């Protein structure tokens, strides 16, 4: 995205837009410096029926005094059940000839190519992704977060985590987000 903006190209990104808040800030700063460049962040949930149904219920006053939201995903993907016996970074492998590894890495700390960092698996590693929550949180939390105008949480507490270590995120977790009282 940064390279495209610097070269006066319009940018459309899907989640994950960035891996860290700092990376997202840098992207927003770059977009502000190029006001004639169109930038957009997509979330396919904004095109699905549940998004419009929730909005209709909000507009009709059916949803109003919300004090708690429970959101979950119980449909694991192939990359959400990684090998929890990994206790070191994987060794380098032969780089596929059609992959520009340096471009793929972007601003991520350098790692030698390994298939376990690529093709979906990148989601689990701290240096590449954001785990199952980062992968699916945008889908399962976004609609309620937007229409209830929740803003940023003032407290986030990990209540349960399974399948993580010093190298990758949990593949299962229960996290409590506390938000300021709504207006």
Per-segment meaning from a language model:
Residues 1-46, 61:
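Beta-strand-loop-alpha-helix segment that lines the small-molecule cofactor/substrate pocket
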Residues 178:
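Short hydrophobic/aromatic beta-strand micro-patches
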């Amino acid at each position: 995205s940064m390279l495209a903006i610097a070269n006066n190209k319009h940018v459309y990104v899907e989640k994950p837009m960035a891996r860290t808040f700092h990376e997202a800030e840098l992207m927003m700063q770059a977009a502000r410096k190029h006001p004639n460049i169109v930038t957009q962040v997509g979330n396919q949930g904004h095109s699905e029926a549940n998004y419009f149904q929730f909005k209709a219920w909000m507009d009709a006053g059916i949803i109003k005094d919300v004090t708690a939201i429970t959101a979950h995903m119980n449909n694991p993907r192939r990359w959400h059940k990684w090998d929890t016996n990994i206790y070191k970074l994987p060794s380098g492998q032969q780089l596929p000839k059609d992959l520009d590894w340096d471009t793929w890495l972007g601003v991520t700390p350098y790692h030698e190519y390994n298939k376990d960092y690529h093709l979906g698996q990148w989601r689990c590693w701290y240096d590449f992704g954001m785990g199952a929550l980062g992968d699916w949180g945008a889908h399962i939390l976004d609609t309620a977060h937007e229409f209830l105008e929740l803003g940023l949480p003032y407290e986030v507490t990990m209540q349960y985590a399974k399948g993580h270590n010093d190298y990758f995120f949990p593949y299962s977790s229960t996290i409590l987000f506390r938000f300021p009282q709504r207006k």
